[in-house]
Structure formats: structure tokens, C-alpha cells
């Protein structure tokens, strides 16, 4: 049970968060877009793979399978077999991810400065509408990838209205 719970936290909590951050920031860092269909395939293949790997381990732990021993009783073989298949599927997801990154670098279109079309908030100069696309934070107001010394002056916020908390009646 401990093995399943621990790896659920690592593989599905932390790792999926890292992939989400990668896919969100990739166009900004590299300056190219990726194929969203390939990214969704990567997500679903990895999701199915890690669930097939770690969900059966809950049953193994509750059935008393010991950890850290070189050989397990044959009674645990079916669930271990399912976990092994899930690991192979997760391994395939690694190749889908690698191909997604390769495809983006080789064939990706140029990314806009604000590829996710975040709404406006900052202005950097009096002609900010020529330089940026009204981003909610500074990183979306400059080109992708971000050039060195991106701002000539400190940008100032246009409005703080979206930052106010709702009033409770």
C-alpha cells in the first residue's frame, strides 16, 4: 500500500505538474509551438500507464506483499503483471513526449509573444500597444523567446481592477 500511495504522489502529482508547466512555458522559452494533439496523446498514454502501474499495488500492499525482497510469492503475480504492463505503457509515453518535443523544434510554428492569449494588464511605454499584446504579466508582453534586456523602461500596470476581491454581502 505504501509503494502505491508514495508513487501516486510522485508520478501523478509532481510529474504531471512538471509536464503541465513544461507544456505551458515551452512556447515562451523556445519560441515555437507544439502539436497539441501529440501533447494530449502523451497525457492520456502516461495517465493510463501510471494508473495501470500503481493502482494494482494498492491491492498488493493490502494483501500483504512485502517490500524490498528479491522474490515474491506466485500469489502476487497477476497484479505484478498488470503493473508491469502499465510500466511499459508509461515507457511508451516517454517516447511520445520526446517525439512531441522533436516535432515542435523541427516543425513548430513561431510562437506569439502571448501564445495563450492572456488578457491585458501591463503597458511598457506610451506606445505599448505596438510592442506587446496586453499581457497579464510581464513575460507575456515580450517576444518569444524573451530577448536579452527586454524592457527599456519599467512597465506600469494599466489597471488593478481584476486584482480586487469580491465583496461579501
Predicted regions and their residues:
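Conserved small/polar residues in nucleotide/adenosyl-binding loops
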Residues: 161-167
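Hydrophobic cores of alpha-helical transmembrane segments in multi-pass integral membrane proteins
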Residues: 2-31, 35-69, 73-119, 124-160
Amino acid at each position: 500500500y505504501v509503494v502505491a500511495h508514495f508513487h501516486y504522489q510522485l508520478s501523478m502529482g509532481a510529474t504531471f505538474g512538471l509536464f503541465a508547466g513544461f507544456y505551458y512555458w515551452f512556447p515562451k522559452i523556445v519560441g515555437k509551438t507544439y502539436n497539441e494533439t501529440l501533447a494530449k496523446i502523451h497525457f492520456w498514454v502516461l495517465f493510463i500507464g501510471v494508473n495501470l502501474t500503481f493502482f494494482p499495488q494498492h491491492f498488493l500492499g493490502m494483501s500483504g506483499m512485502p517490500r524490498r525482497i528479491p522474490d515474491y510469492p506466485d500469489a502476487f503475480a497477476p497484479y505484478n503483471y498488470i503493473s508491469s504492463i502499465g510500466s511499459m505503457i508509461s515507457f511508451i509515453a516517454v517516447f511520445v513526449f520526446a517525439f512531441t518535443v522533436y516535432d515542435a523544434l523541427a516543425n513548430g510554428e513561431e510562437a506569439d509573444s502571448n501564445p495563450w492569449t492572456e488578457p491585458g494588464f501591463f503597458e511598457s511605454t506610451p506606445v505599448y500597444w505596438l510592442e506587446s499584446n496586453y499581457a497579464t504579466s510581464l513575460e507575456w508582453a515580450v517576444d518569444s523567446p524573451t530577448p536579452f534586456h527586454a524592457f527599456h523602461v519599467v512597465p506600469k500596470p494599466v489597471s488593478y481592477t481584476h486584482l480586487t476581491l469580491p465583496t461579501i454581502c
